[in-house]
């Protein structure tokens, strides 16, 4: 959800002596929402702490010529099939509150973008890792469907 990169990363590291990757062991599906998704990456311009680095890439500030934070509804441009986007129509509207965007090393993990003057990766999926830059919990029926889809993945 909403927060700052460094305190969020420290809270995970302080929670357990195990490394995050060792804890989930490529078996436990993980959904990162907004900051949670950003924490999947190696580093963020927002802080000095190392990210979880389960998805290669970095997190960068939205360009300063844009209104920051990006707050409000925006539509999804779905690029490929995704387990959490099952049944979600291309062009569906979702709710964003963010100042940063992810820059994955592997663009293939981006399954949907949003247009905010630039293309913003809105949904990423790679193995057990699922991330949304927007807030599905604030995105009405579409967001509820995505959360149900994720829970279905968890049941398998």
Give the ranges of each region predicted by the language model:
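Short amphipathic alpha-helical segments and helix-helix/interface helices
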Residues: 17-21, 85, 147
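Pocket-forming structural segment of enzyme catalytic cores
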Residues: 42-118
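Short, surface-exposed beta-strand/loop micro-motifs that present aromatic residues
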Residues: 118-125
């Amino acid at each position: 959800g909403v927060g700052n990169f460094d305190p969020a990363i420290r809270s995970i590291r302080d929670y357990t002596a195990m490394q995050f990757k060792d804890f989930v062991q490529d078996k436990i599906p993980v959904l990162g929402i907004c900051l949670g998704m950003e924490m999947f990456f190696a580093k963020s311009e927002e802080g000095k702490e190392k990210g979880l680095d389960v998805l290669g890439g970095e997190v960068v500030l939205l360009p300063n010529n844009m209104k920051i934070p990006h707050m409000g509804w925006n539509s999804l441009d779905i690029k490929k099939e995704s387990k959490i986007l099952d049944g979600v129509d291309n062009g569906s509207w979702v709710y964003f509150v963010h100042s940063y965007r992810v820059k994955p090393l592997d663009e293939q993990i981006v399954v949907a973008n949003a247009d905010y003057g630039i293309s913003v990766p809105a949904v990423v999926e790679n193995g057990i890792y699922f991330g949304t830059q927007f807030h599905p919990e604030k995105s009405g029926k579409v967001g509820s469907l995505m959360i149900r889809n994720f829970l279905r993945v968890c049941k398998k």
